């Protein structure tokens, strides 16, 4: 096969295929389970990854842009319930489990929205968003989930469409 086919199919409100596909929950539900039972939440994340991989492969989709690695700061309705959690360690752990499930199903993963979209309220599909936080703040918070997943071997990263004014006056993606 010479052509890679990708889709936004992460679960919750960003699930492009619905008919005859498993209804994948929004990722913050797994984060809520994590608060009560980490082991169970990780099993669920892995199973969801496997389901996504198996169902998409059955219709010749090579990969999905998932998981969302953003921190849920409670500010962004665009990210919000798409994020696993508001803390870095649970995000990294649950995303790792989801990726393990994707890989078990023969699918690679693409983490998003580098270097972090959870702090921004603006919908970057309709408006220009600017994150004026110092680079050090972004590096010591938002980027840590990406760094953690890069260390374990995530195969792709999708940038956000945000201007990080402490770095550049152009959008990152």
Q: What are the roles of these predicted feature ranges?
A:
Residues 16-20, 75-78, 121-125, 168-170:
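Short acidic, glycine/serine/threonine-rich loops at helix termini
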Residues 1-76, 84-108:
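N-terminal beta-rich core of secreted/periplasmic extracellular enzymes
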Residues 1, 90-173:
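Second-shell residues forming the walls of enzyme active-site clefts
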């Amino acid at each position: 096969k010479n052509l890679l086919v990708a889709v936004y199919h992460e679960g919750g409100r960003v699930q492009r295929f619905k008919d005859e596909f498993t209804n994948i929950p929004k990722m913050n539900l797994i984060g809520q389970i994590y608060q009560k039972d980490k082991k169970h939440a990780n099993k669920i994340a892995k199973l969801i990854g496997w389901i996504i991989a198996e169902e998409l492969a059955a219709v010749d989709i090579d990969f999905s842009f998932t998981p969302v690695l953003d921190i849920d700061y409670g500010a962004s309705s665009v990210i919000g319930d798409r994020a696993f959690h508001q803390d870095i360690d649970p995000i990294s752990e649950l995303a790792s489990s989801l990726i393990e499930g994707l890989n078990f199903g023969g699918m690679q993963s693409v983490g998003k929205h580098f270097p972090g979209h959870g702090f921004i309220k603006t919908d970057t599909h309709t408006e220009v968003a600017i994150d004026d936080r110092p680079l050090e703040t972004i590096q010591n918070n938002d980027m840590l989930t990406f760094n953690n997943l890069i260390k374990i071997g995530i195969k792709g990263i999708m940038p956000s469409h945000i201007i990080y004014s402490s770095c550049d006056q152009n959008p990152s993606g």
